[in-house]
Each structure stands twice: as C-alpha cells, then as structure tokens.
Amino acid sequence: MDGAMENLYRKIAAIGRRFRAERVVLFGSRARGDNRSRSDIDIAVFGVSPDDLPAFREQLDELPTLLEFDLVFVTEQTNPKLVANIERDGVILMDKMQEKYEKLVQAVHRLDEAIVDYDQMGLDSIRDG
C-alpha cells in the first residue's frame, strides 16, 4: 500500500471517530489487494446514527481523491452475506473498542512506571498531610 492511500485511510478513520463510529472497515478489492488503480474504495461503517449518515458521506466525498467511495452503513438489517464478506476480507481502519483497549494498556504501563518510581523513592520521602 502506498503512502497516499495510507494517508487517505487515516483520514477515513478520523471521520469515523468524529461521528463516533464503532468500527470502520475497508473491504472489497482494496482490502484483498486485488484492486486496479481506479477501483473504488469499499468502506463499511458500524454504529453511526442514521441521522449522521448524510454528513458522514459528505465528509468522505470531500477527501482529496478522485476515487469513488462505495459506502455501506452496517445495521441489523444489512444482508448477512455482505456482513460475512466484510468480516472475512475486511481491514479494520478504526475500531473504538481496540482504541480504548490500547489506551487502557498505556495507562497501566504508566501506572507500573509510577509504582516503580514510588518504590525507588523510599519511605523517607513520604509525609503525612
């Protein structure tokens, strides 16, 4: 994948975050790697409010690319075969739960470092009040 496409995918993920999507997934030929240079960009979006769909699509259309977007907003009514295809071939661009997990891991790491620092300070530096 070239740098321009990676940058575009980061911008798509940022739009997903802005609209509080649960997940944004690249699927289709670009996810599988069998795309042509002019292939469209298939994007599946999970967990966006139906009221936000037009604005989400508008922001995608403003991205700096000549490529077309094929956008699927996944709901409970989405064809199960399509969802299975997205799950099988998809490349996750943004996942809210994964990002929360990564932040938790970072916080635990910082806490571990703080505990080590505290232990190295010794009890003499602890004051009451």
Model-inferred region functions:
Residues 39-41:
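Periplasmic OmpA-like peptidoglycan-binding domain that tethers envelope proteins to the cell wall
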Residues 44-46:
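Short hydrophobic/aromatic beta-strand micro-patches
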